[in-house]
Amino acid sequence: MAKKKKKVDENNSVLATNRKARHDYHIIDTWEAGVVLLGTEIKSLREGKVSLVDSFATIDNGEIWLQHLHIPQYSMGSWTNHTPKRTRKLLLHRNEIDSLMGKVRDGNRTLVPLKLYLKNGRVKLELGLAQGKQDYDKRQDIKRRTEEREVTRELGRRIKGINA
């Protein structure tokens, strides 16, 4: 009996990633948080229009808020459209919020959004506890990546030379 083909699930897809955050910060730990959104924001997200650049999370009165997440207005929306850069509430369990509060207060750490995605039809945000990198750390990462790339390239050449 043949196996069923897997369908591409529109309810589980990545909407945006914050590549700059992984470049500028050491990611210490990650959490999954729900995002409170309006109807036109969801529709705009499903069109793939979102920018995580320069966004961050803050903790106020025991609640986590996402700042500077840019979701453009929905093209088919009318007067009910949302403001593109409004502050959005993140949904986490109380014990997770309390542990995050302690970790952010301890040192020079911040909460950075890493990825925005759909999970079972709900918008989720991968939130990272991050510590800023120095310039020399960034240079070391670039050097390490180029060395790894050269090694894999050389291995590929040698394997092709042996098999050819």
From Swiss-Prot:
Please give the CDD domains that the UniProt record associates with this protein: SmpB
User: Which residue ranges run through the membrane?
Assistant: none
PANTHER family tied to this protein: SSRA-BINDING PROTEIN (PTHR30308:SF2), TMRNA-BINDING COMPONENT OF TRANS-TRANSLATION TAGGING COMPLEX (PTHR30308)
Pfam families hit by this protein: SmpB
**What keywords appear on the UniProt entry?**
Cytoplasm, RNA-binding
The protein depicted here goes by the name: SsrA-binding protein
- Give any Gene Ontology cellular component: cytosol
Q: List localization entries.
A: Cytoplasm
Q: InterPro entries annotated for this entry? A: SmpB, SsrA-bd_prot, SsrA-bd_prot_CS
Top-rank taxon: Bacteria
Q: Which family does it belong to?
A: Belongs to the SmpB family.
The Swiss-Prot or TrEMBL record annotates one GO molecular function as: RNA binding
- List the GO biological process terms: trans-translation
Q: What does this protein do?
A: Required for rescue of stalled ribosomes mediated by trans-translation. Binds to transfer-messenger RNA (tmRNA), required for stable association of tmRNA with ribosomes. tmRNA and SmpB together mimic tRNA shape, replacing the anticodon stem-loop with SmpB. tmRNA is encoded by the ssrA gene; the 2 termini fold to resemble tRNA(Ala) and it encodes a 'tag peptide', a short internal open reading frame. During trans-translation Ala-aminoacylated tmRNA acts like a tRNA, entering the A-site of stalled ribosomes, displacing the stalled mRNA.
